[in-house]
């Protein structure tokens, strides 16, 4: 488990579970301009040999454009080597996906 604090009370907890070539990433907290670089670095370290990526947003409270950029980067990589889906998306984050068009780019369950 990786914890990243961004100065104040805002924090992003990243927990990864790798089974065979299936990586599940659990995010808790806020994915914003401060925490997105840590997620991006964490994903670069983990995604290389993965054929299935699952992003679990059950405990994600917020996502900014910087977080969306990280998701897009992961989606581009996974479209070449396997599949990616986002699960347990809150209504607020689903609305952000709809407004930005990410609802049509990502597989959301």
Question: What are the language-model segments listed below?
Answer:
Residues 6-7, 104:
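Intrinsically disordered and other compositionally biased segments
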Residues 4, 10-39:
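STAS-typified acidic loop motif
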Residues 5-6, 96:
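Intrinsically disordered, low-complexity repeat segments enriched in small/polar residues
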Residues 33-105:
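Amphipathic alpha-helical interaction surfaces in cytosolic regulatory modules
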